[in-house]
A protein has these predicted regions:
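Cytoplasmic helix-loop-helix junction between adjacent transmembrane helices
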Residues: 106-142
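Helix-breaking motifs and short loop linkers at transmembrane-helix boundaries and internal kinks
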Residues: 43, 75, 96-101, 130, ...
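Structural signature of the two symmetry-related core transmembrane helices
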Residues: 78-92, 274-289
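Extracytoplasmic gate region of multi-pass secondary transporters
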Residues: 31-32, 208-250, 255-260
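Intracellular juxtamembrane helix-capping segments at the cytosolic ends
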Residues: 116-129, 311-325
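A late C-terminal transmembrane helix in Major Facilitator Superfamily
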Residues: 327-363, 369
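Helix-loop-helix hairpin linking two adjacent transmembrane segments in secondary transporters
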Residues: 130-188
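Conserved MFS/SLC helix-loop-helix module at the cytosolic interface between two early adjacent transmembrane helices
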Residues: 62-101
């Protein structure tokens, strides 16, 4: 009977994690299919419009770096609840007529909520699901990306069935409110307070490997951030409809969800390099397809690129967690990696917007990210488990 109750609690907690994960990306991906209309209504340039994606992502990075402080001063229950409330308020702000300051404020507010949750969840998963960390991390990542797909696919459909097109963006407050109630109901049984540790302090900021992981994570997620910001606009520009362009982004995130579930499940050995290399090859194929054959096989390029991006995200988290058996040290490393990484990733859509303004098309953007993937392949070779810093492995 006790075992059955434990299984029920575990299953319920997994459902709540999925609900929360589904709210991590619609604030970003729902904008892409409406970007031409938003730019026209607000008068934003390409580089300013890119901030709608860049601001939340950079904010995620800053809050990931503050992860240790959050763990020490705010309970997990409260921090996640407040974060979901911020996401809901950020979405509701978009019910008003689109103006640059309002849209950017909503992006920043939602980014704070997303950033806090992403700083908290890896350590929650590592502690709560120690024996199944790769699978649960994959499920969490798949929920993130699945939510992104819903944002891209459903928003154009909502526009078609709404009297005021921009107010459809406010509908994404609803799933955040649902997740808030689910978390508040479930969390007292699972994570009622923050878990302070008395372990020896380890300053990962002074280790070259931590910075390598941060840059690695950032360049991978930079490709994702640029795609959710500009892929629909790219296809609208070359003749596709907003609905079709949003569907392509949704298919890309569907591929991401599949990659996030499948690749961690295949990660049976501590050496993650083969799977990371596979994920990077898939990304390279996708970006090259966008450059040379964008209209011939757009669904294939979107899904292949998504599969690679989706697989790489949880594999990066696992790679960082592998560096220490101590949850406290591993959590610090993941927080630092995500902090530096999301700041770099947040700059990618802005830089892509600048390249678009300079070149007059998006081909230079995709070429830039293809070159980044080649560089990431070279860095991947350095991630042999025998080269992990031994201090992190042994020290508590």
């Amino acid at each position: 009977l006790t075992a059955m109750r434990n299984h029920q609690k575990t299953f319920t907690m997994l459902l709540v994690l999925v609900l929360i994960g589904l709210n991590m990306r619609p604030l970003l991906t729902s904008v892409g299919p409406l970007l031409p209309q938003l730019r026209q209504a607000s008068g934003m340039s390409f580089s300013v419009a890119a901030l709608l994606t860049a601001l939340p992502v950079v904010t995620m990075g800053g809050l990931a770096l503050a992860g240790s402080w959050l763990h020490q001063h705010v309970s997990e229950r409260r921090s996640v609840a407040i974060s979901l409330l911020l996401i809901a308020v950020g979405a509701l702000m978009r019910e008003l007529y689109p103006q640059s300051a309002l849209l950017l404020s909503s992006a920043l507010l939602g980014g704070v909520g997303i950033g806090i949750i992403q700083a908290v969840m890896p350590s929650v998963i590592k502690r709560r699901f120690q024996q199944r960390t790769p699978l649960v991390m994959g499920l969490w990542s798949a929920a993130l990306m699945g939510g992104g797909g819903l944002g891209a696919a459903i928003t154009p459909w909502l526009v078609q069935h709404s009297e005021t097109w921009y107010q459809t963006l406010a509908w994404w407050a609803l799933p955040a409110v649902v997740a808030l109630f689910a978390w508040w109901w479930q969390s007292p049984r699972e994570v009622a307070s923050s878990h302070k540790t008395t372990t020896t302090p380890v300053r990962v900021v002074f280790t070259p490997r931590a910075w390598t992981l941060g840059v690695y994570f950032g360049l991978i997620n930079g490709g994702y951030a640029s795609l959710i910001a500009w892929l629909p606009a790219f296809y609208i520009e070359i003749g596709a409809s907003a609905q079709y362009s949003g569907s392509l982004l949704a298919l890309m995130t569907l591929g991401q969800a599949a990659g996030a579930l499948l690749m961690p499940a295949m990660a049976r050995h501590q050496d993650r390099r083969k799977l990371l290399m596979l994920a990077l090859v898939l990304q390279l194929v996708g970006f090259c397809g966008f450059i040379w054959l964008p209209m011939q096989l757009p669904v294939l390029w979107a899904m292949v690129c998504g599969l690679g991006l989706g697989g790489a995200f949880p594999l990066c988290l696992l790679l960082a967690l592998d560096h220490s058996v101590q949850p406290a040290i591993a959590g610090k490393l993941v927080a630092f990696m995500q902090g530096i990484g999301f700041i770099i990733a947040g700059l990618a859509p802005w830089f892509s917007g600048v390249l678009r303004s300079i070149s007059g098309n998006y081909l230079m953007d995709w070429a830039f990210h293809a070159l980044c993937v080649v560089g990431l392949m070279i860095i991947t070779l350095r991630f042999a488990p025998v080269r992990f810093p031994q201090l992190w492995v042994k020290e508590a």
